[in-house]
Regions:
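Extended beta-strand/beta-hairpin segments
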Residues: 1-52, 59-142
Length: 142
């Protein structure tokens, strides 16, 4: 399986702007710029897209873990926060914090915690950042 996305940029870093599109066209000419990345401008940015990808990936992995354990979720809601920091050699993503709230009829806390930890470790986006960014998880069974 292979998925693609493209980015187009015009101009310099601070005064330029660009657009991002995905193969599925869910994102089509979605605007991004220095302002959207560093100053709360209108549009998206790479870190926001990574957060969305990680939240989605982890949530699907958790659903698979719970379903495999015989306790399919009623609902899962995950937020991912990506931290971008300036380092000596440039900017780096240093941490990703996942917060998930789960309604899982029949699941006990210990089994849920194990499923969440396994999902965090097994999610392909988590694997991508392993060793490069601290990934933390707050998993709540509600």
């Amino acid at each position: 399986m292979e998925r693609t996305a493209s980015a187009v940029w015009h101009g310099g870093l601070k005064d330029g702007k660009g657009s991002i599109s995905t193969q599925s066209t869910t994102l089509k000419d979605t605007q991004y710029s220095f302002s959207t990345r560093f100053e709360n401008g209108v549009g998206t940015n790479p870190e926001e897209l990574i957060a969305a990808a990680h939240a989605g990936c982890f949530t699907m992995a958790l659903s698979a873990q719970l379903t495999g354990a015989g306790t399919p979720p009623e609902s899962l809601e995950t937020t991912a926060s990506v931290r971008l920091e300036k380092k000596d050699d440039g900017f780096a993503i240093t941490a990703i914090h996942l917060v998930t709230k789960a309604k899982v009829p029949g699941a006990d806390k210990a089994a849920f915690d194990k499923a969440a930890a396994d999902a965090k470790a097994g999610c392909p986006i988590s694997k991508l950042f392993k060793g490069n960014a601290e990934i933390t998880l707050d998993a709540q069974l509600i």
